[in-house]
Amino acid sequence: MQTLSAPDISSSKPAALTEATIVRRKTRPVPVGSITIGGGNPVVVQSMINEDTLDIEGSVAAIRRLHEIGCEIVRVTVPSMAHAKAMAEIRAKLHRTYKPVPLVADVHHNGLKIALEVANHVDNVRINPGLYVFEKPKADRTEYTQAEFDEIGAKIRETLEPLVLSLKTQNKSMRIGVNHGSLAERMLFTYGDTPEGMVESALEFIRICESLGYYHLEISLKASRVPVMLAANRLMVQRMDELGMDYPLHLGVTEAGDGEYGRIKSTAGIGTLLAEGIGDTIRVSLTEAPEKEIPVCYSILQALGLRKTMVEYVACPSCGRTLFNLEEVLHKVREATKHLTGLDIAVMGCIVNGPGEMADADYGYVGKQAGHISLYRGREEVKKVPEDQGVEELINLIKADGRWVDP
């Protein structure tokens, strides 16, 4: 998957409203296998397989399918010690039959022993602060005393320290992944079911890691409601700035659903923060096959100018001035050129807005008179051809410029 040069990185606050280029928040580089998150690197795309990790063959095939279509980091669920040990076989088989793929293990309830085992077989371990040291809620509880709060905090440190030291020794990373729906009971009593509670959950684990000299951390604060996800991540950035922290953020909307709305919901959350310069890696969570998440990720990044991995199409919405069937022609142009990378192609229905709106495009396809198409290279009109030859001649123009590759 080709990626063009990344946008400028700045330690300043998000760009002013007049800026046309997104200025990303400066973050520390965090390794996940051969991929680096943060540190000015392009925003990383990741997803998670659906297969049971005990199914070695199925898991390897699923990881490979995702990686082959551009998923740069793949997460797997590890709910038991047997699953943790299975990761050794999965990793070995990937190396033997395909290639190394950056792998993340997802560890949840009281997961110290599981995490310690799987840390030997993956590149990153994701833990959920609300579940890593799980205290069963008491139905009759009305408050947490400071002593009770601190007692659990000490237990968290005791349980987290061995994992931190293992990852530190192996030069591997950790994701502190907070979910709005699984905040620890003591956080709920102290901060409420709020973005503040999510941020404080993350900070508690970050402070423990820092006290042990461990900084290979990425942070995520996810929620199924977009406004909560936005507020939590913005507050996390504010608090990290106040504390002098520069950890990269993993963005996502949990339980976004499926279909058009699931994609819109994910884009509303992820895209909004990326536009503010916040975010170093993303996952679009859909109730569909994981492979369907990857194109959405790359489309969000391309729309924001953060990564260019496909053709950028500029096309007008059509109106009474349009001189050809715009929808049909756009479909033909897209089908003929969608395998290319790094080009901007404009398909405009008339001369009124065509040349101006497509001024930044590499190539233009414009209806200037009935039955004929004008082809442009940048702002220059190159030739006028019969409409039925338009797509073919556009391809010939791209080929003549040496920018065509066969699909």
From Swiss-Prot:
GO BP term (any one): terpenoid biosynthetic process
Amino acids binding [4Fe-4S] cluster:
316, 319, 350, 357
**Keywords linked to the UniProt accession:** 4Fe-4S, Iron, Iron-sulfur, Isoprene biosynthesis, Metal-binding, Oxidoreductase
Q: Does the keyword Transferase apply?
A: no
Q: Which cofactor does it need?
A: [4Fe-4S] cluster
Q: Which reaction does it catalyse?
A: (2E)-4-hydroxy-3-methylbut-2-enyl diphosphate + 2 oxidized [2Fe-2S]-[ferredoxin] + H2O = 2-C-methyl-D-erythritol 2,4-cyclic diphosphate + 2 reduced [2Fe-2S]-[ferredoxin] + H(+)
What sort of enzyme, by top EC class, is this? Answer: oxidoreductase
Taxonomy, superkingdom: Bacteria
GO terms (molecular function) for this protein are:
4 iron, 4 sulfur cluster binding; 4-hydroxy-3-methylbut-2-en-1-yl diphosphate synthase activity (ferredoxin); iron ion binding
- UniProt KW Iron-sulfur keyword: yes
Signal sequence, start to end: none
Instruction: Provide the E.C. number(s) assigned to this enzyme.
Output: 1.17.7.1
The pathway that the record names for this protein is: Isoprenoid biosynthesis; isopentenyl diphosphate biosynthesis via DXP pathway; isopentenyl diphosphate from 1-deoxy-D-xylulose 5-phosphate: step 5/6
Cofactor: how bound: Binds 1 [4Fe-4S] cluster.
Q: What does this protein do?
A: Converts 2C-methyl-D-erythritol 2,4-cyclodiphosphate (ME-2,4cPP) into 1-hydroxy-2-methyl-2-(E)-butenyl 4-diphosphate.
Family (UniProt):
Belongs to the IspG family.
Protein known as: 4-hydroxy-3-methylbut-2-en-1-yl diphosphate synthase (ferredoxin)
